[in-house]
């Protein structure tokens, strides 16, 4: 054992404790007494106002005798007083406001400027009354010593100029401006004059501008202060648009050329940006002889002596390319492109092994400037593709694009990720050139980059899968080999972060995957992940996004066995899950299924599991189900679903009679009233439900076509796998037998018309199925997955009904429906044992059916229902 520590080390004696207490008592004595109130009784008395005063009287009193904070409150409330009682406000309150503003502080001045602007925008008074009462107050405070206050009043005045008549502008603003713009006035006064002149040019005719405004403009362009010259230069764009092309060429352009050679860098920068913005006004000669040499000079000086213009130059490169397109000689074109490439890698060549803390501040500032330049280059990359022609992208710009996608700075990669969709559109068939860069950005370590990329991820992937010369099917399998690992890694990275909105957005965008990759790839790589997110994630919007995307995956899954497995998982793990949270998510999933699938699909698989939750022990689950019941009822069709309607009504009655939770009971009562008001949809088309029934019919057709496609693929695989002798024997057998015998035994025939059909008709039936399947493959997956409630257009409907040669609509639908029933009976996976069957609700189960038909009780009633629907368009 270790020896005990010495007594000195354990300082917990009674004396030491008393010493601590004495120290604490001393601290309490030193403490200053805390005031119980922030205001003294005298101050409270001064701030108290008689509550019987009207709003106008209270405002007058506070502006006269109140404190500054009370006066500011009255001025902030001035727009309300103007709306309530404009006459009294103008007569009694506004004079007090004028008096208060003479000695007001910054806060009251800013509040007044904002209130005056609000009154103008609200149109509480006429323009004439506003001019008479408010304009002089605004003009009086334009030259306030505080720059922020002066700018606030200036913004108000510029808005007032938009609505004032010409005569008022001339007498109240333009005439006084002549003296305000003189050199004898303050710099602030001349700066204000520059901005007012830029606004006035759009209000007068060219003659007045030439005679009264342009002399002032020239004078201010040659002002001794660089701030004034720069400010006036930035207003030349507005002035040029007001005076027309001729005066711009003769007056504005010479001033811009002179200002572009100014000694002040801010003036040169303003001149350059104004020239770029005015490119469309100048003709080809002016661009080639005057502006192009200036741009060339700017580009050369930017690297040598004037780096301050680099950021602006890189930002306006796109406009320059567009405005000077067709003017460059081949040599100038090449030099400009090389200049852009140089900007894209600016600062990347300067490698150093210093720590960021050891880098001098000047170097850090320069690196920030270079990052901004590269970011602007990324922003203008689509414009540069147009500049070099997309056909030359690989030779001219691919290496630059590669550098931007791999830039060490996040803002650069973020910007190029935003532009990625535009780049993909411009490349069109050459989009395959940037496959690797898409994967790189999907795997980027920064979630900001991923978030920017996924905004247009469905459109990008669609271009990737359909671009080039190969077909859609080939692209789905071969063109993006690294896409699936990149997508899964991106989702896992988003899930591991705290940025759940990015995760939610990514899951929503995954709904486009059925158009890009195969059904099996989605099933094995993404479906289980959606289940995991629904079961384990803690963020509700993320869970809902995963649920909706899973429903879309299920909607376009092309294997019935996989579909059944997913449905069973949804019901067992969510609908019958131990956690009430999972059962709530099951109801969310049911809502998405109602939206995405046909009514018959929901009724067959999810109707009964959903209404069984009326017996759930958790009140929140029952409450959520009550909100969903109107949508559940809307999936029923009478008379085929009469038995389901009876079960729904029985569950609602039990809730009304047995519900003990008062909140749930209140919602049940409201839901019952809503259910009673609902009109039921019939099997036959009704005028009021025509559009909804048509959309539902289209969804059902697509679901049946998926089954047909699966059956055709299996038949094709079986035929491809048999020996040649078997195929020859089958061909001879088909030639000698009747068409009815040549069809599979488990598909009953329901074809009206003659009993004998030629062998060619059998081929036409299969051919029509193949045509419909191919048309569905080409059309159904092109739907906008964000709006799946809007199904395929009428063209697909026409293609479906007119593709059958020699047979009517009834026969085709009968065959399709029979195959649907047969698949239900024959292709259920082995995991579905008789003891735990997949919950299924069939319409018309009360009718008896010959068990030899297809093994499903509802085959004939279902067939009749479909026939009646198709025969009543």
Swiss-Prot record:
Residues with Phosphoserine modification: 775
Region annotation Disordered: where it falls in the sequence: 713-766, 822-873
Keyword Oxidoreductase: no
Localisation: Cytoplasm
Superkingdom per UniProt: Eukaryota
UniProt entry keywords in alphabetical sequence: Coiled coil, Cytoplasm, Phosphoprotein, Repeat
Any one GO BP annotation for this protein: blastocyst hatching
Keyword Phosphoprotein attributed: yes
Ranges of biased composition (kind: Low complexity): 747-762
Bias (Basic residues): 864-873
Composition skew (Polar residues), residue ranges: 822-858
Disulfide bridge partners, by residue number: none
Coiled-coil residue spans: 686-720
GO cellular component: ciliary basal body; cilium; cytoplasm; cytosol; intracellular membrane-bounded organelle; protein serine/threonine phosphatase complex
Single GO molecular function: protein serine/threonine phosphatase inhibitor activity
Phosphothreonine carried by residues: 797
Compositional bias per record (Basic and acidic residues), positions renumbered to this chain: 713-737
HEAT repeat ranges per the UniProt record: 213-251, 252-290, 392-427
Subunit structure as annotated in this protein's UniProt entry: Serine/threonine-protein phosphatase 4 (PP4) occurs in different assemblies of the catalytic and one or more regulatory subunits. Component of the PP4 complex PPP4C-PPP4R4.
Function as written in the Swiss-Prot or TrEMBL entry: Putative regulatory subunit of serine/threonine-protein phosphatase 4.
Protein name: Serine/threonine-protein phosphatase 4 regulatory subunit 4
């Amino acid at each position: 054992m270790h020896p005990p520590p010495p007594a000195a080390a354990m300082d917990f004696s009674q004396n030491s404790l008393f010493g601590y207490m004495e120290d604490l008592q001393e601290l309490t004595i030193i403490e200053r007494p805390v005031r119980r109130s922030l205001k003294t009784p005298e101050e409270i008395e001064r701030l108290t106002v008689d509550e019987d005063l009207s709003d106008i009287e209270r405002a007058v009193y506070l502006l006269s005798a109140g404190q500054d904070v009370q006066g500011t409150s009255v001025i902030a409330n001035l727009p309300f007083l103007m709306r309530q009682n404009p006459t009294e406000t103008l007569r009694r309150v506004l004079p007090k406001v004028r008096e208060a503003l003479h000695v007001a502080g910054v806060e009251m001045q800013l509040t007044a400027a904002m209130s005056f602007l609000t009154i103008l925008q609200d149109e509480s008074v006429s323009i004439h009354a506003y001019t008479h009462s408010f304009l002089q107050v605004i003009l009086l405070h334009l030259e306030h010593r505080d720059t922020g206050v002066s700018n606030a009043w200036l913004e108000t005045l510029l808005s007032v100029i938009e609505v004032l008549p010409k005569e008022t502008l001339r007498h109240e603003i333009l005439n006084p401006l002549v003296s305000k713009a003189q050199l004898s006035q303050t710099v602030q006064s001349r700066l204000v004059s520059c901005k007012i002149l830029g606004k006035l040019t759009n209000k007068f005719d060219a003659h007045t501008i030439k005679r009264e405004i342009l002399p002032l403009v020239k004078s201010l362009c040659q002002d001794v202060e660089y701030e004034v010259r720069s400010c006036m230069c930035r207003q030349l764009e507005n002035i040029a648009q007001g005076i027309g092309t001729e005066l711009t060429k003769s007056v504005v352009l010479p001033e811009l050329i002179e200002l572009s050679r100014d000694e002040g860098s801010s003036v040169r920068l303003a001149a350059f940006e104004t020239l770029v913005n005015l490119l469309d006004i100048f003709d080809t000669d002016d661009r080639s002889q005057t502006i192009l040499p200036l741009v060339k000079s700017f580009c050369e000086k930017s690297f040598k002596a004037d780096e301050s213009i680099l950021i602006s130059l890189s930002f306006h490169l796109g406009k320059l390319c567009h405005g000077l397109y067709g003017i460059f000689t081949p040599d100038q074109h090449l030099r400009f492109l090389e200049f852009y490439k140089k900007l894209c890698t600016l600062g990347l060549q300067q490698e150093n092994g210093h720590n960021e803390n050891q880098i001098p501040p000047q170097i850090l500032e320069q690196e920030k400037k270079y990052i901004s330049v590269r970011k602007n280059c990324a922003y203008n990359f689509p414009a540069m593709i147009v500049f070099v022609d997309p056909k030359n992208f690989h030779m001219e710009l691919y290496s630059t694009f590669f550098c931007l996608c791999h830039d060490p700075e996040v803002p650069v990669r973020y910007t190029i990720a935003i532009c990625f969709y535009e780049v993909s559109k411009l490349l069109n068939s050459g989009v395959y050139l940037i496959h690797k860069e898409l994967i790189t950005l999907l795997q980027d370590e920064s979630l900001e980059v991923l978030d920017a990329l996924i905004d247009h991820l469905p459109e990008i992937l669609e271009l990737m899968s359909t671009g080039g010369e190969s077909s859609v099917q080939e692209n789905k399998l071969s063109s993006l080999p690294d896409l699936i690992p990149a997508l899964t890694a991106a989702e896992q990275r988003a899930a591991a972060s705290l940025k759940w909105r990015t995760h939610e957005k990514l899951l929503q965008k995954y709904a486009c995957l059925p158009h890009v990759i195969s059904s099996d790839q989605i099933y094995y790589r993404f479906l289980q992940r959606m289940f995991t997110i629904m079961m384990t994630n803690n963020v509700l919007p993320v869970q809902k996004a995963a649920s909706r995307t899973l429903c879309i995956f299920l909607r376009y899954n092309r294997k019935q066995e996989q579909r059944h497995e997913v449905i069973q998982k949804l019901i067992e793990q969510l609908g019958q899950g131990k956690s009430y949270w999972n059962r709530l998510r099951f109801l969310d999933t049911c809502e998405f299924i109602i939206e995405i699938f046909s009514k018959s699909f929901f009724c067959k698989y999810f109707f009964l599991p959903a209404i069984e939750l009326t017996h759930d022990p958790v009140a929140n689950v029952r409450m959520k189900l009550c909100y969903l019941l109107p949508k559940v009822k809307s999936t029923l069709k009478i008379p085929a679903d009469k038995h389901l309607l009876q079960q729904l009504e029985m569950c609602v009655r039990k809730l009304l009679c047995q519900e003990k939770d008062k909140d749930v009971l209140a919602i049940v009562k409201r839901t019952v009233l809503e259910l009673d008001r609902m009109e039921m949809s019939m099997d036959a088309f009704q005028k009021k439900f025509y559009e909804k029934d048509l959309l539902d019919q289209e969804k059902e057709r697509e679901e049946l076509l998926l089954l047909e496609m699966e059956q055709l693929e299996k038949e094709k695989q079986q035929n491809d796998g048999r020996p040649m002798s078997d195929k020859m024997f089958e061909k001879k057998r088909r030639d000698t037998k009747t068409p009815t015998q040549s069809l599979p035994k488990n598909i009953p025939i329901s074809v009206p018309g003659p009993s004998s059909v030629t062998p060619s008709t059998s081929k036409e039936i299969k051919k029509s199925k193949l045509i419909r399947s191919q048309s569905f493959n080409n059309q159904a997956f092109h739907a906008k997955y964000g709006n799946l409630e809007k199904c395929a257009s009428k063209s697909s409907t026409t293609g479906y009904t007119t593709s059958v040669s020699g047979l009517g609509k009834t026969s085709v639908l009968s065959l399709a429906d029979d195959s649907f029933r047969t698949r239900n009976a024959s292709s259920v996976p082995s995991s579905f044992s008789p003891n735990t069957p997949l919950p299924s609700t069939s319409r018309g189960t009360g009718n008896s059916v010959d068990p030899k038909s297809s093994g499903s009780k509802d085959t004939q009633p279902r067939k009749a229902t479909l026939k009646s629907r198709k025969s009543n368009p």
